Amino acid sequence: MEQQVVLSFFSYDKNRFWAFTQMQRAIPQLQQQPGIQFFRTLGTGAGLGFSLWPDFSTYALLTVWESEASATAFLDNSSLIKSYLTKSASQKHFQLDTLQSHGLWGKTNPFETSQRPLEPDEKIGIITRATLRPIRLLEFWREVPAASKAIQQAKGVLWYKGIGEWPFVQQATFSLWNSLEEVKDFAYKSTHHAAIVKKTRKRNWYKEDLFARFAVRPLHLKHD
């Protein structure tokens, strides 16, 4: 059995208060799901990338499963996921196979590397996540506009969104890329990106951080 990661984004026209309350209310139900190894209920940032301002119309759900079968059972049969689908106006779903993951999220690395090879033309998903040191918050947020501009100008990025557990302190992003080569070009050749990465290490911004790279498979959920 290979681990399966699913990341879903739900956008709301109505039911926004319900969506906000699910950040806490969904946790007991998720804890009881057979085969679940890790999960996070996540808010999102306004606009694209990191943002000081929340997007109260969009929320995300990250789940990690011991197998594709347990993930499928949850997505097909869970009353919780059906309520998300019914109450939201639109959704984006990403089925993720881990290619690489290093660092920690809540004192653990939840993503196990898949043994399957990357297929030609597969899209790439990137999750970056960090808990910021309180003393470094102002420095970090001063650099956010430059970081957002760098990814906006990156060749091959198809979509990206800021996500997080707590505003200001626990921040993450998910980005979808056309190819692994274009991810590497951005990581190693972008002067803006390289400067920011260097500064994070030099200034010790993060109490905890994680970087994970995934192969992305199409995932379409239907609801009544």
Show the residue positions of the predicted features.
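A common structural junction motif
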Residues: 79-85, 194-195
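Extended hydrophobic/aromatic segments used for targeting, binding, or gating
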Residues: 185-186, 191-208
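Short S/T/G/P-rich N-terminal loop/turn motif that feeds into the first structured element of a domain
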Residues: 1-59, 68-74, 87-172, 182-189, ...
